[in-house]
Regions:
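Surface-exposed loop/turn motifs in large extracellular/passenger domains
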Residues: 1-13, 21-43, 51-73, 81-107, ...
Length: 173
């Protein structure tokens, strides 16, 4: 998916298992956002990234130029920008943010704001944030809140930038 020029996306909402912008359930999402593009809101469906991979999918996302992401929010277990829920085999985020961009991302429960979804199976993506000679990105990333499995076990929350948690019913605080 390429979003470029002066494109404005007011709202993109993923259905069950689908990213707001990117892959569907069991699908990888490759998304390029550049130019003066603006994403006002991208919300992942259950287990999916706001921008990137669907449930059990990896996300490869490039944001450059003067692009603005006002709000990228992962669904439960999905990164704001990056991978969806990994099911122990996927869910990684390969992310590049550069130039005069502004990015705001929040992970779903247990997931990274920018990076991996929950249960990426020890797989790690590559995250690059870099300026140019003329400007540098403004990035606000918030990891998802702690995960509870319904039996009273609480796992860790996700990193702002990096990896999501690995749910484990044997984990106790």
């Amino acid at each position: 998916i390429k979003i470029t020029g002066d494109a404005v996306i007011k709202s993109a909402v993923g259905g069950g298992g689908g990213a707001g912008i990117g892959g569907g359930q069991w699908g990888n999402g490759t998304v390029t956002i550049s130019g003066d593009s603006k994403i006002e809101s991208a919300l992942g469906g259950g287990l999916s990234a706001g921008i990137g991979g669907g449930a059990v999918g990896n996300g490869t996302v490039s944001i450059s130029g003067n692009a603005t992401i006002e709000n990228a929010q992962g669904g439960k277990d999905g990164a704001g920008i990056g991978g969806g829920y990994g099911y122990g085999q996927s869910g990684t985020g390969d992310i590049t943010i550069e130039g005069n961009t502004t990015v705001n991302a929040t992970g779903g429960m247990g997931s990274a704001g920018i990076g991996n979804g929950t249960d990426a199976g020890g797989n790690n993506g590559q995250i690059t944030i870099r300026g140019t000679k003329d400007s540098s990105p403004t990035v606000n990333a918030t990891g998802g809140i702690a995960e509870e499995d319904g039996q009273g076990y609480v796992g860790p929350g996700g990193a702002g930038i990096g990896v999501g948690s690995t749910t484990d019913s044997e984990y106790t605080p």
